[in-house]
From Swiss-Prot:
This is Glutamate 5-kinase. The lineage of its organism: Bacteria, Bacillati, Bacillota, Bacilli, Lactobacillales. Pathway: Amino-acid biosynthesis; L-proline biosynthesis; L-glutamate 5-semialdehyde from L-glutamate: step 1/2. Pfam families: AA_kinase, PUA. Belongs to the glutamate 5-kinase family.
Amino acid sequence: MKYKRIVFKVGTSSLTNEDGSLSRSKVKDITQQLAMLHEAGHELILVSSGAIAAGFGALGFKKRPTKIADKQASAAVGQGLLLEEYTTNLLLRQIVSAQILLTQDDFVDKRRYKNAHQALSVLLNRGAIPIINENDSVVIDELKVGDNDTLSAQVAAMVQADLLVFLTDVDGLYTGNPNSDPRAKRLERIETINREIIDMAGGAGSSNGTGGMLTKIKAATIATESGVPVYICSSLKSDSMIEAAEETEDGSYFVAQEKGLRTQKQWLAFYAQSQGSIWVDKGAAEALSQHGKSLLLSGIVEAEGVFSYGDIVTVFDKESGKSLGKGRVQFGASALEDILRSQKAKGVLIYRDDWISITPEIQLLFTEF
């Protein structure tokens, strides 16, 4: 079995009728495929949209609401109804499901990140299928992941999945918009996510985007940098999930980095919030970015910001101004200032295990999304 642990992301369009309401037949089809994969020995996580679609009708709305409060209320009702559909269908095959609602704070806060990771690990080891969504009924903008594509990538990275599958209304990434460009071709294998790939997906200055593809490329960057390959394929075929797991479905495959980021490094790269800035000399910059060394106090040129022991700071090359990465400091700002002023700077500010270098792909993620 090539892909034992798989995260599937199913969007609203794959779960709803033409009027925007929840399609029970589509939910049933998804759960049947999950059951077959589960019985074959796969460990599965489903990141599912559809809470608003499941709930707005029950509250008397004639169509999907647009006001935030109405959508949150619909999600509050619909999340339970959606989970009931999944649970009922899975229990018919003696499979236990579990609901987990997450916000961005569950990834940013180191303790909550660890707790979520542990809970998911127990569920998977016990044979349950976690069904995950963002906590749309209460989340505010500051704590939003923003979309379930990104959420699914964050979850896949957290649990070190073997594959992340996006089921969408487009069967992969195309060189152009296949709906309007007859010359558009599907890319079957993407080795590196770069500016060209972002433009194909609908980046700035491009009109090629289809199927919310840009957010999927953002998500694919998080996943592949964390060592998780990504598959984008159509949800329109009846056995699309099974075929994706077996790599027989038509789609676009994004290759994972050989040395994917460990959980601690993922947190540093994607979620840890910087409390200050450090500028280093050329020697320290090379030691960090090229040789994987710790950051010595002797290589520090300048420090800025209010930070304490154990906080995260961003490190820059003083000569080029380039951001090198982020790390956890062994001294607070005041203590560091005293050390630098004394000109007796000996010791380590950031150990290599508490450091993450910013690769071109990760830098692109920060600047383009």
